[in-house]
């Protein structure tokens, strides 16, 4: 086993030559990187220093945003009238922005995004109610809803998510957030007044009817 790499990323060892070729294999990696599982053949030369460069890939992440909302799926008719039935379903056409919730720093210490910087604008959910942002550096992010689908209320909700290192054998970190929105609602008020005096009158009874087809 060779010593760990130093500040320059180098490690060396002196061995007695008992064969022409040995192999070099990475055992562990610095935090934030993926383990290189390849074995490198190294040909030994007496009295010479043989060099081998091993390059590690940084662990990256993907972030998926899911959108749910109530959809009219039916109606129940009773003696008291009609009550609508709503079901929570996936929603398309929701729009989101992603921001850095803290400085986003690569594994080698490079600052990729400063805190509050815009990482991606205009992420829009598809027919499956989701949208995915790939190739993110590990760190803390904020997802903010910019626009809700038709008939749903956009409150400008924000959610924070931390994409953390998952170990040297995990190729990609997967993270997700789910947004749920209330449907837009309407209320109808009816007031009964005397035509001449404009006083409010008790006892009036009214029915509310559909002016056109209401479809689920």
What are the residue ranges of the model-derived segments?
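Solvent-exposed loop/turn and edge beta-strand elements of beta-rich ligand-binding domains
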Residues: 1-216
């Amino acid at each position: 086993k060779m010593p760990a790499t130093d500040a320059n990323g180098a490690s060396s060892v002196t061995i007695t030559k008992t064969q022409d070729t040995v192999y070099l294999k990475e055992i562990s990696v610095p935090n934030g990187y993926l383990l290189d599982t390849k074995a490198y053949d190294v040909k030994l030369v007496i009295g010479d220093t043989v060099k081998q460069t091993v390059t590690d890939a940084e662990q990256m992440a993907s972030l998926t945003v899911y959108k749910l909302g109530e959809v009219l799926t039916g109606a129940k008719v009773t003696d008291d009238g009609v009550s609508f039935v709503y079901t929570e379903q996936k929603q398309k056409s929701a729009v989101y922005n992603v921001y850095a919730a803290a400085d986003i720093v690569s594994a080698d210490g490079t600052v990729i995004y400063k805190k509050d910087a815009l990482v991606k604008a205009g992420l829009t959910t598809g027919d499956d109610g989701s949208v995915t942002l790939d190739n993110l550096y590990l760190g803390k992010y904020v997802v903010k809803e910019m626009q809700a689908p038709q008939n749903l209320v956009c409150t400008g909700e924000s959610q924070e998510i931390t994409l953390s290192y998952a170990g040297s054998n995990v190729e990609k970190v997967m993270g997700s957030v789910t947004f749920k929105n209330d449907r837009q609602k309407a209320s109808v008020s009816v007031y009964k007044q005397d035509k001449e005096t404009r006083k409010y009158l008790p006892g009036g009874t009214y029915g509310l009817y559909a002016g056109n087809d209401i479809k689920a």
